[in-house]
């Protein structure tokens, strides 16, 4: 009998997950287009989060970009909620195990678009075993200029990502 190995339990892959994209490809394309063009693309795409609330990415990004702040320059952050506290879900684990570069590219594109210099990945406590591989991925991205100061060789852009490990409790949504 043939042995079948399950890697991530995705039965149907969309266009993003079905193709291999080199690390940084989406980030370089987003930087080349610029923040306003990226917002326009998000509006047309009608891309929505995977959390179930149905909020469009455009509304989240536009709100963050236009938000006022008492501090100058304004501090903006990109938060990726990988807590996955909903019963029976494993989308975050799959994405971070098999497609971490796409997640980090997406966070970086969001950062450039909204004017953030810091991203925070909130990782579910039960997924602590993913932490070493994710940290190595972030270090590789820094060595390759895909995170940190002078993002993608641009002295005027900076973006970095930190990982914060949760304690195993459901916290909140993205908004």
Residue ranges: model-predicted function:
Residues 1-175:
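Feature of Fe-S/electron-transfer and energy-metabolism proteins
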């Amino acid at each position: 009998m043939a042995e079948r190995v399950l890697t991530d339990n995705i039965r149907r892959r969309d266009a993003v997950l079905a193709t291999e994209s080199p690390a940084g490809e989406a980030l370089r394309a987003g930087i080349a287009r610029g923040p306003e063009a990226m917002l326009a693309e998000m509006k047309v795409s009608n891309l929505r989060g995977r959390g179930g609330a149905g909020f469009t990415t455009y509304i989240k990004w536009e709100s963050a970009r236009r938000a006022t702040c008492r501090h100058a320059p304004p501090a903006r952050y990109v938060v990726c909620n990988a807590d996955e506290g909903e019963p029976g879900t494993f989308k975050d684990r799959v994405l971070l195990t098999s497609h971490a570069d796409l997640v980090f590219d997406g966070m970086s594109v969001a950062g450039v678009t909204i004017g953030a210099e810091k991203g925070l990945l909130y990782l579910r406590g039960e997924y602590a075993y993913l932490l070493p591989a994710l940290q190595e991925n972030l270090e590789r991205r820094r060595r390759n200029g895909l995170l940190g100061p002078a993002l993608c060789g641009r002295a005027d852009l900076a973006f970095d990502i930190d990982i914060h490990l949760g304690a195993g409790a459901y916290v909140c949504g993205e908004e």
